[in-house]
């Protein structure tokens, strides 16, 4: 039995109980009969791998699960009760931002003893966050409906999500979380094209496109302060790929099983994006001024919880976020973006991008 350790926002304690028999009942609860039936209908094994996908603006969390074909299919969508901060990645401790990016969840990040019923630590900061000088701690997917940098799901929903994650970790080392600001459509990217995070989001979209085009889990690496997806050694290369999160990216190619399908999706999206810009689609406000959001299904039950961000952030802290200076970088010729996702003529998908870092 894989140990599920106590590791969470509410204690960061060393594990005392590591066997399923000694864990609290809420952490060992079996999947419901309805969920087991759904798995059977979708041809998914109880302990097959999962991927969790989070869409902040829509306030939805999806659990995808590998079926008997070896590809991931959507199992279930859960409405998010509460997330805090604004659209955009976590930058520094105390900014109330919820993480965006790609995170690897190991058994030690499962917290059966959370004060918020059950919790899954997202593993922030990951190597990308560290390479870009971002910090924060104990950022979770948990129960309850309150958030300070976490995705709060309610106790009932986290019970099911936690159980699915627990079963998926039996016999394997980890599963992946993909956290996005919104569904990565051309329309949403066009609406948010003036955001200081637009370049970061376009980088996330590459990973999103790999998954949506293939329904296969992407391998994720970090080099040069950026994400790299499904990298393979170049043909006739004798050297193994080594990725330094802060160093220059090595020469690589993209897994050919993924590259062509992802490229087709990217090209179609690129054309749609260019047309939206040509039509002068309306631009969303860069910052909403509100502290996060929640799915509409919870608004009647929890009225008045979405307040101005200024009410919950200390003066001179997160309110400085819009004034942060971006750090420029340009893709090298061997990068995935240049090799497989070059912009179409006249498109607004630029290869020169900027990633925000906190002022120190």
Task: Describe each model-derived feature in a short phrase.
Residues 61-66, 154:
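A short alpha-helix/helix-coil micro-patch that ends at or immediately precedes a cysteine
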Residues 33-51, 63-65, 82-93, 100-106, ...:
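N-terminal post-signal-peptidase region of extra-cytosolic proteins
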Residues 31, 185-360:
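Low-complexity, Gly/Ser/Thr/Pro-rich intrinsically disordered linker/tail segments
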